[in-house]
Amino acid sequence: TEENVTGIAMTPYTPQGKSLPGLRRNDTYYTSLPTNSVQAVMINKIFVDKAETGAYGLQPVWPTTLAHELGHYLGLFHVFSGGDNGQTTDYCEDTPDYDRPAYDTWLASVYRPTFAQAAQRQDRNGTTFTSYNIMDYYYSYRDRITPDQRARIRHVLDYSPLIPGPKIAVENMSRAEIIIEEPLILK
């Protein structure tokens, strides 16, 4: 429901010749921005003036939500997986992947953990780490990206035609205006 969603973002697409794993590919290139399809980041107005309260104090929700959603808009994915499949979900080798449902279970079992304790995770190899990544959820410092994430962002900025800014030319691309139907929306 909208009361539970703090923000959403559309992910970019990259040209066929310069694609990135996990992102949509297209073999055409926009010559101008479409008028009936908007690539955007949205923050739920319910959360703009709201602060999370709890054992860790009062913290505004929207600044980290905005940074997180901008990460999606620039080609980043969550740094956790949803269960037993053991698959890294963000296509970045330098972000530790952890099992989010297992973390949820652990967190629910601990009586009033400190923020530092709640920010601890165990990766798929059993190694404990502290969550600092902006693409994480829950209790995390959420103030960093990794070099691989930076490289993905740079690639999207250089090649994705719907992100403003100068682009690196891609050979053998048609210059037709095409509207992408059903953009991928991440929460």
Task: Describe these PLM feature segments.
Residues 1, 129, 151-155:
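Extended N-terminal export/anchoring regions of large proteins
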Residues 1-81:
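Active-site-proximal segment of zinc-dependent metalloprotease catalytic domains
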Residues 8, 115-118, 168, 175:
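Residue-level detector of intrinsically disordered, flexible termini
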Residues 13-16, 22, 97, 102, ...:
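Generic low-complexity segments that are intrinsically disordered, proline-rich and/or Lys/Arg-biased
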Residues 18, 121-124, 175, 187:
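Surface-exposed charge patches in extracellular/virion surface proteins
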Residues 49, 53-144:
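The catalytic-center signature of Zn2+-dependent metalloproteases
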Residues 139-186:
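Pan-zinc metallopeptidase signature
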